[in-house]
From Swiss-Prot:
GO MF, one annotated term: cysteine-type endopeptidase activity
Active site: 153, 291, 331
Residues of the propeptide: 22-127
Single GO biological process annotation from the record: proteolysis involved in protein catabolic process
Any Pfam family matching the protein: Peptidase_C1
Uppermost EC category: hydrolase
Gene that encodes it: CTSW
Tissues and organs where the protein is expressed, per its UniProt entry: Expressed predominantly in natural killer cells, and in cytotoxic T cells.
Free-text function comment from the UniProt entry: May have a specific function in the mechanism or regulation of T-cell cytolytic activity. (Microbial infection) Plays a role during influenza virus infection in lungs cells ex vivo. Acts at the level of virus entering host cytoplasm from late endosome.
UniProt name for this protein: Cathepsin W
InterPro entries attached to this UniProt entry: Papain-like_cys_pep_sf, Pept_asp_AS, Pept_his_AS, Peptidase_C1A, Peptidase_C1A_C, Peptidase_C1A_papain-like, Prot_inhib_I29
Length: 376
């Protein structure tokens, strides 16, 4: 009986071999003795992610981009300070500019609306649990969604926030309509991007949201198709607030009340596969945030190598490595991307601007707490 391997496994092996020789800008014709390996890796990429191209010229163009992105993944691997792994992803045949146009949004956030803010600066800092993962509460987090070519991460993050709060607060397992947020948005730009508060304003204006079942996602804005009173509302919000730009406070709130939305710089995500991203402000500017996601937990991981780092002095004893603290984030690019649709960012260094817009809806009175505690 012949042995077979899944395309993703073969692709990983081929890419690992190619990466050993990649150190600079790369095109298909620059590979010298390696063109067959590159072409085979690209063929497996097409099979795994169901890619086809309209002409030989387009195929050659995408092959060049694929080769360039292999080199870029290698550079990211060398620059990252965490445990992240970069390589072939569903977006490996896109240029950085194309990826940004499809999934990022660079609108200046000067129009931040007036909203409530969490004011706790005079209170002593409370302890934060070692870890918190709302995914471990049965059905608390709705399934991973795929925004496809509609740049609506802002709407999907807001919908995920509302769904989760209803699930952990009231045991009401609803999936709310992202399409209603797109069709009825009065502040956002639909599939051209927006901010999470745009979605929350629409929810307040519409007195709630219909279900995903009644008002399903179409992947595009439908002009003159906003019918906020046509379908029964299954979830609504009291208001929304901006949390303090402090990772300790964000962790406290997350563990106590549930997942929140954050808006980050998505630059390292195009070629991300798994692990904890720890980028520097130079490689991932915390001021240039362009992608909204749902923050669902936090924890720590030991050094992947599992070895003790030697100190500068040869006479000193080796010291155990410090654990790497991380945030767990739910993305909206489908379950084939990242860690089954999730990813992790370093916690404690404002990686990729995670503290810039920590925003959440509220679906209950401020003095009430959810009926469920966040499991470690």
């Amino acid at each position: 009986m012949a042995l077979t391997a899944h395309p993703s496994c073969l692709l990983a092996l081929l890419v690992a071999g190619l990466a050993q020789g990649i150190r600079g800008p790369l095109r298909a014709q620059d590979l010298g003795p390696q063109p067959l390996e590159l072409k085979e890796a690209f063929k497996l990429f097409q099979i795994q992610f169901n890619r086809s191209y309209l002409s030989p010229e387009e195929h050659a163009h995408r092959l060049d981009i694929f080769a360039h992105n292999l080199a870029q993944a290698q550079r990211l691997q060398e620059e990252d300070l965490g445990t992240a792994e970069f390589g072939v992803t569903p977006f490996s045949d896109l240029t950085e500019e194309e990826f940004g146009q499809l999934y990022g949004y660079r609108r200046a956030a000067g129009g931040v609306p007036s909203m409530g803010r969490e004011i706790r600066s005079e209170e002593p800092e409370e302890s934060v649990p070692f870890s918190c993962d709302w995914r471990k509460v049965a059905s608390a987090i709705s399934p991973i969604k795929d925004q496809k070519n509609c740049n609506c991460c802002w709407a999907m993050a807001a919908a995920g926030n509302i769904e989760t709060l209803w699930r952990i607060s009231f045991w009401d397992f609803v999936d709310v309509s992202v399409q209603e947020l797109l069709d009825c948005g009065r502040c956002g730009d639909g599939c051209h991007g927006g901010f999470v508060w745009d979605a929350f304003i629409t929810v307040l204006n519409n007195s709630g949201l219909a279900s995903e079942k009644d008002y399903p996602f179409q992947g595009k804005v439908r002009a003159h198709r906003c019918h906020p009173k046509k379908y029964q509302k299954v979830a609504w919000i009291q208001d929304f607030i901006m949390l303090q730009n402090n990772e300790h406070r964000i962790a406290q709130y997350l563990a106590t009340y549930g997942p929140i939305t954050v808006t980050i710089n998505m630059k390292p995500l195009q070629l991300y596969r798994k692990g904890v991203i720890k980028a520097t402000p130079t490689t991932c500017d915390p001021q240039l945030v362009d992608h909204s996601v749902l923050l669902v937990g936090f924890g720590s991981v030991k050094s992947e190598e599992g070895i003790w780092a030697e100190t500068v002095s040869s006479q000193s004893q080796p010291q155990p490595p410090h654990p790497t603290p991380y945030w767990i984030l739910k993305n909206s690019w489908g379950a084939q991307w990242g860690e089954k649709g999730y990813f992790r960012l370093h916690r404690g260094s404002n990686t990729c601007g995670i503290t810039k817009f920590p925003l959440t809806a509220r679906v209950q009175k401020p003095d009430m707490k959810p009926r469920v505690s966040c499991p470690p």
